[in-house]
Amino acid sequence: MESKAIIEEVKTKPRKESTSSSSSTSTSSSIEEDKTNHLIIDKNTIDIEYQKLKHNSEDNFEKFVSEIEEVKVIPKKSRTCCNNHKNEHNYLLEDEDRNIEEIVTSKGFNFEKHFVKTEDGYTLALFRIPGGKNCEDGSKLPPVLLQHGIFDSADGWVCNGEKHSIAFVLANHNFDVWLSNSRGNKYCKKHDKYRTNSFEFWQFSFHELGIYDIPAVIKYIRNENKSGEKIIYFGHSQGTSLMFSGIVEKYDFYKNNIKLFVALAPIARLNHLGSTLLSILSDISLHKLMSKVEAYEVCPQSDGTSNFMNFMNQNLNGLTNFFIGLVSDDNSKECNDQNALSVYLKHFPCGTSLKCLIHYVQIIKEKKFIYFDYKKDANFALYHQKNPPEYDLSKIKDIPIMLITGEKDKLSTPDDVRWLYNKLKANVIYLDIVPNMGHLSFMCGNNFSWFKEPLEYIIDEFYPK
């Protein structure tokens, strides 16, 4: 990818009309359309009058666009609604008591378990869906890696039914799909030296995931996949934070191994946080509070937690929606399908380290995308300065990036994504702020039509016929 000053700036192109073709690159059979106007931005140039935006987009989008220098945008084309979404969700409860392998194989896909050792001694579980249904060998298909967010696991990518889960849709479009798990979640509690009840085991934040976990996983995938293709990386939430930090720290490695970085609900700076719960947590000394009881793990998965959350969802759905609104989504109605939530909540939360949470609290307090703050003396030893430095996002070059967030996301807010875009815009080839979408909507939302456009874009731009 050329790295000029945005080449000709980020502009728009009209998307291709979907056809009834049964080709593996057609998205029409898997993702239906809605009638919402999006703002889509990419580098392909075409002369389109900017005045159309003023008449067709909502005020908040006009504000968003007006502050992006010299960018021309148009409203996304009209789309028809996902009419069969509720019909599919009638069958979702069958997945409620299934593990991830059972969910995948019950839909006719093959499933593989792999284990990867990191440089610093952790053993990670890595799952694979090698192409479409009954595909025995996905080794020559283009590889895709999906990395979950905080408190989540690989399960999150398959909990929303075959037609509305990113992992299944990509597999059905003949990608070799790999699902990674972060150290410390329910699948990754083994270390060469430390036990899971030790302080040392839990000394990691998203920073370590970006410099140890994902590089180990990528090396493993490229060895198993024989296509010779670089990897398309999808990250959700923390899955984007670790990639931003990882590229800054290990630029050459990622440049040589990543074909495209798709950032869903990207998290870097958190200056416009709308989450009431996280705002409260940022004012509490979590480290002191939890260290007193030697709590190094946060929100581990347990039958009690899963059963309680599922009971609340089935019997007190309004309370579930309230909690979702409190934490992450300003429009909880977008992910209020009880069947979909029941499946997702059976697999969530899956645990992470206290240090991960503290790192985000520090970012909230400092209003900067900073390295972990170990306090004065340790910072001097590690960073050679009193305060932790910011991650230098200007080091991210020549890696194509797609930024996609929701208009109603309280964590990955449009304002913070705008800041991120301006930091990365020489690399950003696609930008979408999806109306009515929140943070959890990417994993268990009612409407999946948002994925049609980016999937078409990926296929058209990176795998043209």
Residues of each region from the PLM?
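Acidic catalytic loop of the alpha/beta-hydrolase fold
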Residues: 408-412
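Alpha/beta-hydrolase-fold enzymes
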Residues: 222-229, 238-380
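Short alpha-helix in the alpha/beta-hydrolase fold that links the catalytic acid
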Residues: 413-422
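Short beta-strand/loop motif that positions the catalytic acidic residue
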Residues: 403-405
